[in-house]
């Protein structure tokens, strides 16, 4: 039973998002005082709110999850979870996570994470994901909130650097998510989810992905140009962005787009891990 309730929080998604929270935190802590306790409290608060959002997503997506091979074995689909209990579970995590951030971090981080939550649950999950080709774009905005909250946990102020970080992660989400949609195209078709590759075809999606990858690379260099990240960051960012660009710009057709999209997806993970990791390695000694 405990395993079932843990699974609907999507631990993998939580872990991935907390890496970006850490990146935002250490980027801000380069020039602002921070502590290990503040760092751990931020991770706990954001992690609980993300877990709550994932549970609500599982609850509301039961009808489409049962149509997709990837999700048809989720506990909420199989009926192993009491939906009323799951709602209470999600609400408890949301309240606890927000309270931790509000009381022990700062009110701004709590407000921003709550706005991201509302955006994800009400705008993305309940409407845009199901009804609009722009669902991925809407989802990318909420997906870029965790690193922003990590940054705000330290600074308690939305600066140009914070906006740049938020923009970076918004741009990263788009080709990453389109790649998933392309190699799981049949699932999305059967569930009736109008993602760009399904609605407008793989070639239009490919053009969009190339544009987003180039934009991400340009924006990611902004942290170095602003003097907020050093040469180690520049080297890693340049390498992973060039790798992502090279893979994304390959020609595709109906015979190879699945293999290609899996490659784009894998490199996208390397990109976010590399950039988040180098920010941590470069800035941890200055932060804590």
From Swiss-Prot:
Coiled coil: none annotated. GO terms for biological process: heme O biosynthetic process. Its EC number is 2.5.1.141. It is a multi-pass membrane protein. GO terms for molecular function: protoheme IX farnesyltransferase activity. CDD domains: PT_UbiA_Cox10. It is an enzyme of class 2 (transferase). Keywords: Cell inner membrane, Cell membrane, Heme biosynthesis, Membrane, Transferase, Transmembrane, Transmembrane helix. It catalyses: heme b + (2E,6E)-farnesyl diphosphate + H2O = Fe(II)-heme o + diphosphate. It comes from the Bacteria. GO terms for cellular component: plasma membrane. Pathway: Porphyrin-containing compound metabolism; heme O biosynthesis; heme O from protoheme: step 1/1. Pfam families: UbiA. Converts heme B (protoheme IX) to heme O by substitution of the vinyl group on carbon 2 of heme B porphyrin ring with a hydroxyethyl farnesyl side group. This is Protoheme IX farnesyltransferase 2. It comes from Vibrio parahaemolyticus serotype O3:K6 (strain RIMD 2210633). The gene is cyoE2.
